[in-house]
Amino acid sequence: VITSLTSSEDSYDSDTIHNTMMKYFGVSADTVDIIYINNNDEREHLGSYVPLEQIGTKTFSCALVAPTTKGGIQVKTANLSWVTCNMIASTLSTSGVTNCQVVAASPFEVSGTGALTGVIMAYETASDVTLDEEKKDLANEELVTTGNLADTVGQSKATAVINETKLQVIENNITDISEITNIVNNISNDYDVTISDDQSE
C-alpha cells in the first residue's frame, strides 16, 4: 500500500509539528509520500465553500491517507473541532473514492481544514489516480452544506439528512430540481429538521 501524509508547512513551528504527527501516525519519511499543505492551499481549495474563520491563517492539521482495495472508506480523527469523520468520508465518496483509510489529526485542537484540504490530494498521489474535478467541486459544496446545517441542527442529523438525500437521488437517478427539493423536504421532516430555501438548494 502506498501511503500519503499531508503535513503543515506554514505553522509557527512546522518541524516540531511535523515530527510530532509522524510519530502519532507511526510512519517515517521513507515509508510515505509527504505532501506539504499551507494556508494558501486551504484557501484555494476550500475558500469558495468554507467560512474563512474556519480556515484561519495557519495550517496545523495533517492527514494520513492509504488507498485500499476493500473495506469501504474508514476515517478516524483527533483534535479536529469542525471537520468530522463523516465530512471526510463523504468528501471522498462524492469525489469518487470507494475504498480508503484516513487518519486526520492535529497535535492540538484546530478546525481541521488543513487535513481536509490534503485528503483528496494525498489520495490522488497515493493511488496515482486523478479524480474528476466536477465531483471534487460537488464534494466541497456538500461539505459546506453539511457543516452549515450542523451548526443549527447538530452534526448527526445534518449528516443523516445529507447522506439519505444523496442516496435517494443517486439510487433513483433523479435530476429534476423540484423532485430533489421534495426529497430534501421529506427527509428533513422525517428528522424533524427545518431547512431554509438556501440550504435546500
What do the predicted segments below correspond to?
Residues I2-D15, V184, D192-E201:
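Residue-level signal for protein termini and structural transition zones
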Residues S93, Q101-D198:
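Soluble oligomerization/assembly scaffold segments of membrane-associated complexes
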Residues V1-Q101, T125:
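N-terminal, leucine/charged-rich tether regions that mediate assembly and partner docking
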